[in-house]
Amino acid sequence: MAVPRRKTSPSRRGMRRSADAIKKPTYVEDKDSGELRRPHHLDLKTGMYKGRQVLKKKES
């Protein structure tokens, strides 16, 4: 069975665990509608993605 040669220092252990934190999702303001949306996702109100109409406009 594989065994580590040296004890992992608290600093190195902390650096490894730094990626485990839960991060807040990023939002950007849409240029056309001004609504907040996730980056690289389409705007559900307008149905636009990268300047193209992908979905039909949502009727409210």
Curated annotation (Swiss-Prot):
Pfam families this protein is in?
Ribosomal_L32p
Q: Where is this region: Disordered?
A: 1-60
Basic and acidic residues bias: start-end ranges: 17-44
Decide whether keyword Membrane is in the record: no
**Keyword Ribosomal protein among record annotations:** yes
Superkingdom classification of source = Bacteria
Which InterPro entries would you find in this protein's record?
Answer: Ribosomal_bL32, Ribosomal_bL32_bact, Ribosomal_zn-bd
Q: Where is the composition biased (Basic residues)?
A: 1-16
Record's GO cellular component terms? cytosolic large ribosomal subunit
One GO MF term on file is: structural constituent of ribosome
Signal sequence range: none
GO process terms (BP): translation
Swiss-Prot/TrEMBL keywords: Ribonucleoprotein, Ribosomal protein
Q: Which family does it belong to?
A: Belongs to the bacterial ribosomal protein bL32 family.
| Family matches, as NCBIfam families | rpmF_bact (TIGR01031)
PANTHER family in the cross-refs: 50S RIBOSOMAL PROTEIN L32, LARGE RIBOSOMAL SUBUNIT PROTEIN BL32
Descriptive protein name: Large ribosomal subunit protein bL32
Name of encoding gene: rpmF
